[in-house]
Amino acid sequence: MNNHQHPASLITSPASRRGFIRGGSALSAVAVALLAGKDVMAQGMKGDTSKDVDILNVALGLEHEAINAYQLGAGSGLLQKPVMDVAVQFQGHHKTHRDALVATIRKLGGQPVAEMKLDEYAKALNAGALKSQGDVLDLAARLELGATNAYLSVIPALGDRELAKVAARLAADETMHYTVLTSALGRPLPPGALSFGA
């Protein structure tokens, strides 16, 4: 992947998300230590950071996508005030995730993938088809579920409990977002246990 490009197909296609999930298991302890803010811990570690940068850039692409999806929803005029407030809050969570990923990529010597223009996300996400608040919430729920599963995929590769906790916290945010959105849509929650990350 070219770190300066951010093709819409990379972040919006299910195949790319599956690739991130498969590749995520190779995320090194160095990258996760930096993502966790454990710079001192990372200094003594060795690892191939180029693969880590690629994996983290895909995660960053997902965060860029989520931030812009919420922006499209907020600017659509379709959201009622209470829903708008929650959307802005969730967008803030994604901005925090983005900032952590950008800092980690830079600490690894990589170039963070650039955010596309809002109209590029609008096209990639088919924002023109959004005709109701339900449509906006459905789009957000689908993206949050994809992000949940992507973040959960990296946890098994982590041997250190503190490092696994970082990935779990990211996944927890995405799961919370998905659950709130699903509930707002009036849909039943997943009927079975262990329904995320499978």
Language-model region placement:
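All-alpha RGS (Regulator of G-protein Signaling) helical domain and cognate RGS-like helical scaffolds
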Residues: 2-11, 25-29, 35-198
